[in-house]
């Protein structure tokens, strides 16, 4: 079954990367925070990789492949596959996530509101930091053979607030994770501030929140140009659980770091975020990297 999943995903990647369609939407600038849905009939493919300096075990790499599609101008659905490689151990498959999110109101407001749901069919060896919640760290603390055969199913919900001022975006996500194999909920949050690059290689358009999603210059800037650079800051952390909600700093993971994007071409955008752990149970360093490719009018070509 796992081999079939990998083959299907490889075929999908080859189809997307082999297409010559024009980019009209950019990869979300954040690694953890989410805001507006994809434009209608737009597909985004993202390849994400983290290097994590572990707090209590060997350092490791994690990877995630993500595909999202704009079903309507307010509704996006997608899926993710992830895995990890701990130094001294074999590469391990982490599981699948299926997500969907909807912008509640059709027009721009002072605070725009998106609701998000995600089904996670993971195993105990899954280490990719899509979010953090609850208490304690997440380094692998049991034998790998046991962890990879331990199912960890979760339903994640997010209430997302955001607003745009020109090219500047402010986003806040409240996260609730409900264990489907355990009782109780774990809570977390993430927020970010990001300034989009002046040049993005896109047609002049606005995102779902009224944000100027890119305006092509009369002349494309050189490949090495500050006009292609976007920058900001992102923070994520835990907020306890059903029995104890709130900030209990030294018992919860908290991370913060600068986030950068660079427009490589009409089709490609690269992202990087060196994130530092702020508490005793956080990993000291998470170096986050990603590359995204987007095509518009996937099913309804102009």
Residue spans for each PLM region:
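Bacterial N-terminal signal peptides
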Residues: 11-20
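Transmembrane beta-barrel domains of Gram-negative outer membranes and organellar outer membranes
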Residues: 25-302
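Glycine-centered signal
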Residues: 2, 20-22
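Bacterial N-terminal signal peptides that target proteins for export
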Residues: 2-10
């Amino acid at each position: 079954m796992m081999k079939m999943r990998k083959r299907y995903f490889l075929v999908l990647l080859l189809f997307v990367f082999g297409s010559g369609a024009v980019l009209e939407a950019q990869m979300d600038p954040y690694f953890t925070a989410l805001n507006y849905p994809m434009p209608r009939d737009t597909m985004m493919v993202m390849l994400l990789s983290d290097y994590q300096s572990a707090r209590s075990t060997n350092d490791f790499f994690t990877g995630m492949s993500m595909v999202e599609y704009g079903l309507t101008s307010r509704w996006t659905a997608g899926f993710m596959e992830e895995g990890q490689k701990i130094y001294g151990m074999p590469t391990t498959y982490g599981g699948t996530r299926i997500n969907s999110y909807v912008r509640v109101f059709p027009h721009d407001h002072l605070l725009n509101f998106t609701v998000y749901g995600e089904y996670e069919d993971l195993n105990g060896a899954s280490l990719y930091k899509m979010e953090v919640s609850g208490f304690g760290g997440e380094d692998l603390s049991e034998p790998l053979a046991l962890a990879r055969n331990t199912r960890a199913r979760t339903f994640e919900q997010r209430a997302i607030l955001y607003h745009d001022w020109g090219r500047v975006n402010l986003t806040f996500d409240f996260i609730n994770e409900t264990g489907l194999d355990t009782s109780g909920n774990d809570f977390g949050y993430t927020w970010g501030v990001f300034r989009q690059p002046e040049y993005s290689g896109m047609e002049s358009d606005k995102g779902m929140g009224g944000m100027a999603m890119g305006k092509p210059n009369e002349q494309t800037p050189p490949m090495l140009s500050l006009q292609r650079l976007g920058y900001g800051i992102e923070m994520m952390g835990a907020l306890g659980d059903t029995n104890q909600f709130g900030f209990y700093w030294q018992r919860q993971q908290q991370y913060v770091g600068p986030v950068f994007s660079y427009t490589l071409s009409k089709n490609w955008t690269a992202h990087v975020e060196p994130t530092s752990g702020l508490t005793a149970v956080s990993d000291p360093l998470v170096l986050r990297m990603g590359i995204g490719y987007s095509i518009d009018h996937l099913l309804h070509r102009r």
